[in-house]
């Protein structure tokens, strides 16, 4: 009996020791994984002060594999496009994809002799397509380096769209190439145990920016101690003017004369935290106000009359014409195959920025869903009477959010109003509520009833209300407004709260327009809206340098990104009124967002 007890005790001790060892090993592994993740995040912040030297400095010249886009040694696939419009031809893009597929089938490609193509689909001038196979399942991490002490390395983990990001077949875009310089691309292949299998470095000369974009922005480092967020700044900006001289034949004698033509070139630009240009997405004569990831594609305005979907390799999957309409602001996706676009009808006497059209991704059908001239008929009629023209710019839709089934929130800049509209799919859309200064709607009795009341919050609600008699004795004046409503707002975002009927609405209050008490500042506003109570409350307010036209602000947990359009700059700051970093531009930006593109270009 004693012998059995002894055996049991020894067994238990061994099991405890074994379990402890396993837990220690697991904790040690978890710690190492966490440390590696933090190291990767630091490396991907694209800041010189956080990088220990440059990747290219560690590579011997003899080990660099040169890539050539032209000449006798050409080993990079290149594609010619006659125009930006041709880039966004889905048929042209499909033909290019078919050509690359044929090349892949006819030859075996390893990392040493990988298939390279420079911007094959024309949709990103700062990217290279690469394809190769490995013997085992693995993933790739790449670094873009240039011999310039002022430009940091750009490092990311490529996404393979395979389980655990491990695959034997590697096909991705190397992003972040620097325009106008010799770029050194180092690809590191890791096995399933995160062990480095092989490293190769390639060199390639990248052309200058076609759009005339600044290769490096002038930056100012602020006093904030907050760590700058990871990601790329997505800049929607006014186009740069280019002057060309053309020969024009005219007159009976058909004399050739020189004619000066001024055109603007537009592009969506991607900048890193150091202000270095890392992406240039060309657009045709127009730059939109936002882009959206829809399934495995990015959608953005490729021209004033078209929206395009582009996959992670840069291929144009589909381009949708907005038949009969021009884009005039944002678009938004409802999650069910429908895109809603702020638009202007192409008719001669159409009111600008007054329509919302629906684009069905399934078949490209375009249908007008909201006409503000009809929805706010009394306001429109008064504007027509005052201006004596039917195509008066009276409403200025500039932002749109889908907030429920057949429901949307619209921002009308000219009216300094946020308008929630329902019954979008019906012939008679209706207004659920309006957020605006009450005095703006006093002339319109039916609309005035839709304006939500301001709430001072729970603390004010707990205060005892004075009786009429006491008010009369003390001659107490009417309680002042708890806050000023927004005027001339831009870039609205909507988030549903868990409490039924409640939502958070964030926006840039430009603090400009009719009826405003101007003080030279714009503001970040966050409202708590309670539809059930018919109220809205100002929960957050941050003062900013004023921009009266365009601009936006996106709020994060520790920081925000603010685009000051009038000031021609954008800034990342903390919530203690301190700048983390400011970026100065040579032309007016419309909007600036920050995205890490994880799950699309990067893992």
Q: What are the roles of these predicted feature ranges?
A:
Residues 49, 67-71, 160-164, 400, ...:
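Compositionally biased, low-complexity repeat tracts
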Residues 150-165:
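Solvent-exposed serine/threonine-rich low-complexity stretches and specific carbohydrate-binding patches
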Residues 71-140, 144, 168-171, 178-182, ...:
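Histidine-/acidic-rich catalytic cores in large beta-rich domains
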Residues 145-149:
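Short alpha-helical hairpin
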Residues 26-51, 55:
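Ser/Thr/Pro/Gly-rich low-complexity linker/stalk segments immediately outside membranes or between
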Residues 49-84:
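Long lumenal/extracellular ectodomains of secretory and single-pass membrane proteins
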Residues 15-26:
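Hydrophobic alpha-helical membrane-insertion segments, chiefly the h-region
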Residues 1-15:
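N-terminal Sec-pathway targeting helices
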